Every structure is written in structure tokens, then in C-alpha cells.
């Protein structure tokens, strides 16, 4: 098949999943064409059957802002006609689904459109009064719609009352890349022998509650030697950095900005923290689980579908910093519990979220679309 994929190329779950999906599909013999304003963060530069088409950002005095939705639609249509695309698979409803629907009209209606909902396109952006009606239209005009969790599927139904079914296909991870291991040399760059390393990875938006990560770590390091790695960047980073200085722990916290080698970072971590206000799935938690790194997260949204509470990870209420700190200490002190959580997490990924289990679900959906 010849498949077009559009996603945000920035540091976040939807872009990471879309990029990995494209890689996996190309390895299975499909021709995959990415269409976006920049190369997706995790997309390799050179790979057989994998292509990138950059959207040109036009500048015209009449426009106060570049009309990206329209320029993206035009590029989608151009690539469809030039490359003979069978379908467009867009990740994130706004504006990508709107652009795909416009592109379909531009090429005469023969193009199939699949929209995958990832979370904030529904729970934050889409519910804005100025975008609510167009979000609903984009969902209803897509030929198929998927959501990354049952939680998100239900939220979409309750909020937008769509006139078509929404299929749940979960996010996935390549377990051959995200696998257990320990890199003592890399650990030595951050911690002394005997020190524990806690890890957080996110886009540092307010919903990630990165200051909770700092406060959890502050409690842990008072009881045992430990370091914290904060990976990513975003609007909350300065606030988090200020808090480390305020709590006099800045020498124990490393802000590493955006990193490409996430599997390598997992190999230095003893524990992963994700105290988010809301997660429609929680890809970072899944990647940690695949690497056998125990996860402590919040009992919200799709995280309850990813993590079997008390079996493959530990969950606490949003804002329960003391509770998460206690759980962190319990896991770091009890080697048996740490080992059990690590093994159960890896097992859950292999059984439910490994790429070879999920990619065929998308392929089947593509075939279903094209056979209509």
C-alpha cells in the first residue's frame, strides 16, 4: 500500500507513535510518505520505502498568520496525485483531519482518510468553543476514526456525539529496541555507585505536573542517595528548575532537554515517574515498562489501561506527592518488589502493546478501507 501519514513533528507521544508506525509499515513493504512542516522527531533520515514531503509555509502580507491548515491540505493533495497514495492516516484531529478532508475533496473524493485521536486534540484543543464544531466535522467526515485508548474513545463520544464508530487501537512500542538492560558506564555520568536514578520524560506542559516530579524526588533523596533525570523541554521547565534551587537539590537534578536515545536513557534508570494530571494513553510509561523500569504514575485516563495496578506498575491519585514518594521508596528499597514490577511490566508490553501485535490492526483497517 501507499500510505500518507501526517503528525506533529514535535516532541510528544502522537508524533513518536506516528513516526514509529511509519517505520514499521515501511519495513513491512508499504510505501510511507510523511507530510508535515518538519521532519518528525523520531523519524530516521534514510530508510527504504520511507519518504518525507515538507509543507512550504507561505508568507503573504494579507495573512497575519500562515494558513497552515490550507497549505497542508494542498501538500497532501499534491503528494497524493504525484505518488498515487491509497490513503491518508492523520494523527491528531486539529488541524490534520480537517486538512485531509480538504485534500480528499481536492483530488476528487477518491482518497481514504483515517484519523487517529491521541488525547489533547479531544480533551483540550477540540473542546475549545472556537474549534468544537470543526473538530466534530473532521471526525464525522473521516472515513475511519481510531482512538489510542478506551478512555479517549468514551471521552470523544461524550463530548462530540460522533455519527460513526470509533475503534480503539492502542499505542505500541518496538520491544526489540525498548528492552531491559543496564548501562553502568552511562549511569556513572550521573550517579555514584549505590545511588538510585529516577527518570521523567515529557514535553513539560502543565498537564505533566513536572513540579510534582521534583517534589517526589525531594522526598526520596532525603531517605536515600539518589539523582533525578528530567528529559524533555517545554513551558514548565523554568518553573521546575527554579523549584530545584528553592529546595536546594539543583545539584542532584539533571535537566537534559530533548533526547533521541530514549532506550539508552531507560538503561540508566531505576524508576520512572509520570504524575500527570491526565494521560489519554501514556506512551512514556509504556516505553519504560518495555525496558523493565518500574513505573509510578497517576490513576487517570488511559494509564489505567496500560498499567495493571499493583502488578505491572503502581498508581496514585493526581497530586498525591507524599503517596508517590512513599511508593518510590518502597520500590527502591525492596529488590524483590522492584524485580517483580519490572518483569510484569515487560510481560504486559509483550502480550498487549508490542509492535507486531498492534501494526497488523492498522494494516487490517487500511485494507478494510480500500476494499469499500
Where are these regions (language model features)?
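Conserved donor-binding/catalytic core segment of Leloir-type glycosyltransferases
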Residues: 192-217
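Short hydrophobic beta-strand element within catalytic cores of glycosyltransferases
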Residues: 294-297, 307
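N-terminal strand-loop element at the rim of the active site
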Residues: 5-11, 18, 23-70
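Carbohydrate-associated surface elements
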Residues: 151, 172
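Aromatic "clamp/platform" in nucleotide-sugar-dependent glycosyltransferases that forms part
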Residues: 258, 277
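A short helix/loop element that forms part of the nucleotide-sugar donor recognition site in Leloir-type
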Residues: 179-192, 361
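Nucleotide-activated donor-binding/catalytic signature segment of Leloir-type glycosyltransferases, i.e.
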Residues: 241-257
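Conserved acidic donor-binding segment of nucleotide-sugar-dependent glycosyltransferases
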Residues: 309-310, 314-321, 330-336
Amino acid at each position: 500500500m501507499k500510505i500518507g501519514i501526517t503528525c506533529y513533528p514535535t516532541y510528544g507521544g502522537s508524533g513518536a507513535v506516528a513516526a514509529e508506525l511509519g517505520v514499521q509499515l515501511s519495513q513491512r513493504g508499504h510505501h510511507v510518505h510523511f507530510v508535515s512542516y518538519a521532519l518528525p522527531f523520531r523519524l530516521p533520515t534514510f530508510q527504504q520505502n520511507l519518504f518525507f514531503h515538507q509543507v512550504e509555509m507561505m508568507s503573504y502580507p494579507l495573512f497575519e498568520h500562515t494558513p497552515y491548515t490550507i497549505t497542508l491540505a494542498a501538500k497532501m493533495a499534491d503528494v497524493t496525485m504525484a505518488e498515487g497514495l491509497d490513503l491518508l492516516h492523520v494523527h491528531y484531529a486539529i488541524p490534520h483531519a480537517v486538512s485531509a478532508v480538504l485534500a480528499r475533496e481536492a483530488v476528487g473524493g477518491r482518497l481514504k482518510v483515517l484519523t487517529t485521536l491521541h488525547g489533547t486534540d479531544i480533551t483540550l484543543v477540540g473542546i475549545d468553543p472556537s474549534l468544537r464544531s470543526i473538530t466534530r466535522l473532521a471526525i464525522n467526515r473521516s472515513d475511519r476514526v481510531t482512538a489510542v485508548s478506551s478512555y479517549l474513545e468514551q471521552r470523544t463520544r461524550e463530548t462530540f456525539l460522533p455519527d460513526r464508530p470509533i475503534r480503539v487501537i492502542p499505542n505500541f512500542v518496538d520491544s526489540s529496541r525498548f528492552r531491559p538492560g543496564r548501562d553502568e558506564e552511562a549511569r556513572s555520568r550521573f550517579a555514584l555507585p549505590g545511588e538510585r536514578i529516577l527518570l521523567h520524560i515529557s514535553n513539560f506542559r502543565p498537564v505533566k505536573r513536572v513540579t510534582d516530579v521534583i517534589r517526589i524526588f525531594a522526598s526520596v533523596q532525603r531517605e536515600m542517595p539518589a539523582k533525578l533525570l528530567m528529559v524533555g523541554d517545554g513551558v514548565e521547565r523554568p518553573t521546575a528548575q527554579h523549584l530545584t534551587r528553592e529546595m536546594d537539590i539543583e545539584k542532584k537534578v539533571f535537566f537534559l532537554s530533548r533526547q533521541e536515545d530514549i532506550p539508552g536513557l531507560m538503561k540508566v534508570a531505576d524508576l520512572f515517574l509520570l504524575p500527570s494530571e491526565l494521560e489519554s494513553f501514556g506512551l512514556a510509561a509504556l516505553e519504560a515498562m518495555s525496558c523493565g523500569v518500574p513505573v509510578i504514575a497517576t490513576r487517570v485516563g488511559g494509564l489505567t489501561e496500560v498499567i495493571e495496578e499493583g502488578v505491572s506498575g503502581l498508581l496514585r491519585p493526581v497530586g498525591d506527592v507524599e503517596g508517590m514518594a512513599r511508593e518510590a521508596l518502597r520500590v527502591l528499597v525492596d529488590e524483590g518488589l522492584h524485580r517483580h514490577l519490572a518483569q510484569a511490566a515487560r510481560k504486559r508490553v509483550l502480550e498487549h502493546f508490542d509492535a507486531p501485535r498492534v501494526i497488523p490492526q492498522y494494516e487490517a483497517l487500511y485494507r478494510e478501507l480500500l476494499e469499500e
